[in-house]
Amino acid sequence: MDRDSLENRHIWPKDGKEMVYIPEGEFLYGENKEKVSLPAYWIDKTPVTNTEFARFVGATGYVTTAEKTGIGCANTRGKWEDIEGANWRYPGGHGLGDIESMADHPVVQVSWEDATAYAEWAGKRLPTEQEWEKAARGDDGREYPWGNQEPTRELCNFDKHEGRTTPVGKYSPQGDSPFGCVDMSGNIWEWTASQDGDNGRVLRGGGWSHPAKYVRLVLRSVHDPEECYDTDGFRCARCL
C-alpha cells in the first residue's frame, strides 16, 4: 500500500489528529509469528501529545488519576519512585520540569482510565494489542517498525539517551512503521484496550528509559488501570 496516499490518511475532526488506515487482512503476531486476521481500522499516526491532552482537559474539566491521588511514578534518580505532585502537567514532579516546553511531546503520567476518557471524548477508543502490533509491525513479522536492524539513537528514544520523552515525530520517517505510524518503538509505553488477568491492562512499545530489548515490538507490559508512570501514554484507534 502507498502509506502516503490521501486515501490512507484522515484528520479526525474532534481532536484534529491525523489517523492512518490499516487494511483488513493477516499479519504475523507475537513472538511465534502467529497468523492473525483483523478487519480494517484507523489508528492515530502519533501518540496523543501534551497539547492535545490539554485541549481535552480544557473542554471537559477532566481531572486525571495522578492529580486526584497526588502521586505519579517517575524514574528521576535512576530508580522508580512514587513522586508527590507528579502528574501529566509535571511528569517528574514539581520542580522537575513541566509541559510548557514539551507541548509536542507525548502526554505521560496518564492512567488507562485517563486514556480511555480521552478516547471516549474524541469519539474513538484505545486499540487492542493486536491492532497496535499490526500498525507497528506491518504484515511481515519484523522486529521493529523500521525492520530488523537493532535500535540506534537515530531510530528511536530508548535507554535514557535523551533523559526524557522526545517530540512526536523526531525519528520520522526513518523510524516509522510500514503503515507510516510514528514512535511505536521507544519514547513511551502505550496503553491498549486489552486486558491481562483480572485487572491488568496491556501496554506496548517500550519507554524512553528502557534498554533496547524492551523496544522490540513483541514485548508487552501489564499495569493496573489506575497506575501512572512518566513513561506511559497512548494513541487512539477507531473502527471504519
Cite the ranges covered by each PLM segment.
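Short, P/G- and charge-enriched loop/turn segments at secondary-structure junctions
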Residues: 6-10, 31-33, 220-225
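GGW-centered surface loops in extracellular recognition modules
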Residues: 6-21
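Functional-site microenvironments in short loops/helix caps that host divalent-cation chemistry
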Residues: 22, 28, 63, 68-230
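A short N-terminal beta-strand-loop micro-motif at the entrance of redox/enzyme domains
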Residues: 35-40
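Short capping motifs at secondary-structure boundaries
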Residues: 41, 54-65, 122-123
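Acidic, metal-coordinating catalytic segment for phosphate/diphosphate chemistry
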Residues: 49
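Short, structured beta-strand segments at or near domain termini in extracellular proteins/domains
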Residues: 230-240
